[in-house]
């Protein structure tokens, strides 16, 4: 039985679609996006605590964010904050954490999650993860959490579920699907067995290490060499030398789409990847004109369907805008139509 629950939190992204709030020096996972007094990574840790103590949580992040992680999660052991010398996508990031966990926790049962998503119904989230952990505790199985779609979304990948297993709520995965066009997304919604891929995975340590050895032998051999230095003074130098030699590849391409033992647990817990200003607007409280705001004293006159985020400013006044983003951070101001928000990446360069 794999009953030693561990959690891996991926926190290396730069959140470029949320400029100017999110910057390469201080990306969105470390920001109080919702105006609740907690950053997204702190909210992630908070909702996982009933499942797993902080001492059993691991954060994988870019070297330059290590200081921020230590500040925001002060009770996390320093050994559990893993530094990526450079971004190599999610497969090397997850493999590094799993190999390090395995060295001290051979019976680990693991949850992998992004750091920058939002969950509204935390008790249902905890129930779903506990169910998945129970399934993987004694099986050679990878469980991916599928989010029941509420709309024909073109910004997410999808999981196609096949036949149910003998365990209630858990289905075999038929296929992973790339981000669809609108027509295909509408077909997925109508079919009823397609779910959003939230990037939340559950597996035991032997299942994932065997899968990586089978489908990504080069990655496994690099990890084996790195592991010789884990928990020693040489670790930083060895990881700094070897990690950048890993192929840049996502865990979906590296393992999920190849493995035979993939299952999904469809869920509804108010999930959003907070991938855009538009998605943030829909999740924040709105006034009767559809405006959402985060800040101390934001006054809107004759405005409709706007999102205003200016937590640093003592007073902001906006008049006469319809469907706009107004965001200020560290002396940088963005005023942009929500219809054009896909261009924000280039605006922030």
Residue ranges and their predicted role:
Residues 9-11, 60, 111-114, 144-148, ...:
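Short beta-strand segments
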Residues 122-243, 263, 313, 338:
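Conserved core of the sugar-phosphate nucleotidyltransferase
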Residues 59, 82-83, 112, 143-145, ...:
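General beta-strand structural signal in soluble alpha/beta enzymes
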Residues 1-9, 17-24, 35-114, 120-130:
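Conserved N-terminal catalytic core of the sugar/cofactor nucleotidyltransferase
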Residues 4, 205-349:
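Left-handed beta-helix
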Residues 41, 97, 116, 159, ...:
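Residue-level signal for inorganic ion chemistry
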